[in-house]
């Protein structure tokens, strides 16, 4: 069954902690978003880990260099997952994977900006990446760009259980994404901006899994 990941991208740690606690029973993974990591460092990972027991925590570091060291910091802070960019060098990806192996953690590779997703995905799978994520950049979403085509490309070479998708996913786009059955669907901005985030998260979960949670 596809899992739902909550991306906490607001750069206010107290707001993020509150949102994580509010939605913890509706998601399987909580992401400590890049803005939080930039603003608060590893303290953001520690706080979300402490506030949200029972779910997996992903530190969205988007590692581009110094892979082993940077990933180790997040794993020591309590992350279950760390993200590395797919455009990073293989040596960097290997470093993140080594840190994950040392810590018993896992690695998500963010394919944002990758010019050839099937080719790079195949390379990353050979390196041992646990999860590959197609990701429509926030700055491109206003132009109507979405991740569906890239998800289809990813699934040409990647087992669904190692595929994730992120970027502007909303109730009206979720059914088409869910039909492709990736392992993880990441939702951030839609829930962050919603006046009733718990109701919105429940709706997304129902659309994704078919289970009634309201």
What are these regions (language model features)?
Residues 35-39, 61-63, 88-90, 114-115, ...:
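Short C-terminal domain-edge/linker segments immediately following a structured domain
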Residues 96, 151, 178, 189-214:
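C-terminal helical cap(s) of enzyme catalytic domains, especially alpha/beta-barrels
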Residues 24-27, 52, 100, 158, ...:
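Structural signal for hydrophobic packing residues in well-ordered secondary-structure cores
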Residues 145, 151-179, 185, 190-191:
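A C-terminal functional module that forms or caps the active site or interfaces directly
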Residues 1-68, 76, 117, 122-127, ...:
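Conserved N-terminal beta1-alpha1 strand-loop-helix module at the mouth
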Residues 4, 66-160:
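Conserved anion-binding
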Residues 2-8, 30-32, 57-61, 82-84, ...:
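Hydrophobic faces of well-ordered beta-strands that scaffold small-molecule active sites
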């Amino acid at each position: 069954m596809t899992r739902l990941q909550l991306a906490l991208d607001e750069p206010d740690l107290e707001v993020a902690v509150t949102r994580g606690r509010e939605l913890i029973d509706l998601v399987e993974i909580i992401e400590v978003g890049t803005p939080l990591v930039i603003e608060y460092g590893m303290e953001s990972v520690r706080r979300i880990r402490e506030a949200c027991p029972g779910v997996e925590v992903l530190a969205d570091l988007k590692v581009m260099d110094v892979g082993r060291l940077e990933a180790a910091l997040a794993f020591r802070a309590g992350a279950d997952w760390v993200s590395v960019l797919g455009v990073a060098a293989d040596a960097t990806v290997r470093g993140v994977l080594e840190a994950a192996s040392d810590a018993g953690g896992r690695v998500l590779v963010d394919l944002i900006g990758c010019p050839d997703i099937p080719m790079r995905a195949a390379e990353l799978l050979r390196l041992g990446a646990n999860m590959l994520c197609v990701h429509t950049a926030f700055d491109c979403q206003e132009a109507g760009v979405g991740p569906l085509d890239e998800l289809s490309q990813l699934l040409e070479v990647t087992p669904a259980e190692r595929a994730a998708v992120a970027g502007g996913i909303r109730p009206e786009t979720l059914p088409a994404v869910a039909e492709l059955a990736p392992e993880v669907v990441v939702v951030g901005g839609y829930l962050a901006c919603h006046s009733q985030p718990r109701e919105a998260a429940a709706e997304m979960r129902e659309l994704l899994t078919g289970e009634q949670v309201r």
